[in-house]
Amino acid sequence: IFDSCGYLLEKGHGESLFGRVFEQTEFRREDIILQSKCGIVPGVMYDFSKEHILQSVEESLRRLRTDYLDILLLHRPDALMEPEEVAEAFDLLEGSGKVRHFGVSNHTPMQIQLLKKCVRQDLLVNQLQFSIPFSNMVASGLEANMLTDGAVNRDNSVLDFCRLHDMTIQAWSPFQYGFFEGGICLTVRNIRN
């Protein structure tokens, strides 16, 4: 899976680079899975409007130099989204062949349920921050019925929910850039001193 994350690297520059490299190599499009995201708008926060979703996909396709995405994720929850608008956008994208599968990123079980109320496509993925320092979704299940801090369920049982609903959990930042290189440890040590 190549997750281009659309707009985060200098307004799509990463997708443009990938598109150029893809065009200059012997990759066959059907041999790779291309995934992108939409929803985060710098300066505005989030936008899951039909118009924004459709525009984001068009821009990603243009930059990636392809005619379809295998997976489109709604990036971070838009607490004020209209699930009906998301459903309309997904129907148009699927119907036109521009997106084959859909998912979410960083959504809670209730946010997913709200989407499922209107969206008829399966949401196949929930991309979550998951790594050694961010493993609470597993730890809280291991410490059930205990008084430890790890027993506090801060994610609304998202791991169990995804497993019950056959949603793949994709880990984002699994190596937690900077954490294991010492940068964060040095910062913490400097704060303590």
Where are these regions (language model features)?
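N-terminal binding-site loop/beta-alpha segment at the start of enzyme catalytic domains
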Residues: I1-I32, G95, Q176-G178
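Hydrophobic residues in well-ordered beta-strands that form the structural core
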Residues: S4, S36, I169-A171
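Short acidic capping loops at alpha-helix termini that bridge into adjacent secondary structure
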Residues: R28-I32, D67-I71, G97-H101, D122-V125
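A short, structured active-site edge motif that brings together acidic residues
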Residues: E30-P42, Q127-I132
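Active-site mouth loops of central-metabolism enzymes
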Residues: C38-L54, H75, A79-M81, L147
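Short, acidic/polar
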Residues: Y46-R65, E85-E88, P109-L114, R154
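Active-site groove signature of glycoside hydrolases
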Residues: L61-E82
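Beta/alpha (TIM)-barrel catalytic core signal, keyed to glycine-rich beta->alpha loops juxtaposed to Asp/Glu
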Residues: P77, M81-N193
